[in-house]
Amino acid sequence: MGLTLSGRYISLFLAVQIAYLLQAVRAAGKCGTVFKGFSDCLLQLGENMANYPQELDEKENLQTICTYWDDFHSCATTALADCQEGATDLWEKLKKESRNLDFRGSLFELCAGGNGAIRSSVPFGVTLLITALSALVTWMQF
């Protein structure tokens, strides 16, 4: 299956939402390190995905990827924790909206209950890396 046009739009949507979140935090002016912290989270996620062990079986592969995904969310929540003006609430809202997107093979779907197997013909790490990098590029333009 791989990335489709609708998958690109969903990735763009998520990137715009993340950029909106960061812009709102920056406008609040009370989170001096939020950009550095959040970008560090994205970079760590990308690094993990680019370097995860290829020799794992499908179940171990999914568990490893989901661990990286969970670590990213923990990192992002921590980066936003010191911010005021509802930045953490915006992040939680973004995660909820992202879970509700009907995007087969998303990390929210695959990591929700350990139920999924990777069905995409594109390596999952590539898909996630592209999504994370598009968010980072969008963020850097602000």
From Swiss-Prot:
It comes from the Eukaryota. It is found in: Cell membrane; Synapse. PANTHER family: NEURITIN (PTHR15902:SF1), NEURITIN-RELATED (PTHR15902). InterPro entries: Neuritin_fam. Residues 113-142 form a propeptide. Keywords: Cell membrane, Glycoprotein, GPI-anchor, Lipoprotein, Membrane, Signal, Synapse. It is a lipid-anchor; GPI-anchor. This is Neuritin. Belongs to the neuritin family. Pfam families: NRN1. A lipid is attached at residue 112 (GPI-anchor amidated alanine). One of its GO terms (biological process) is neuron projection extension. The gene is nrn1. Residues 1-27 form the signal peptide. GO terms for cellular component: plasma membrane; side of membrane; synapse. Modulates postsynaptic dendritic arbor elaboration and synaptic maturation.
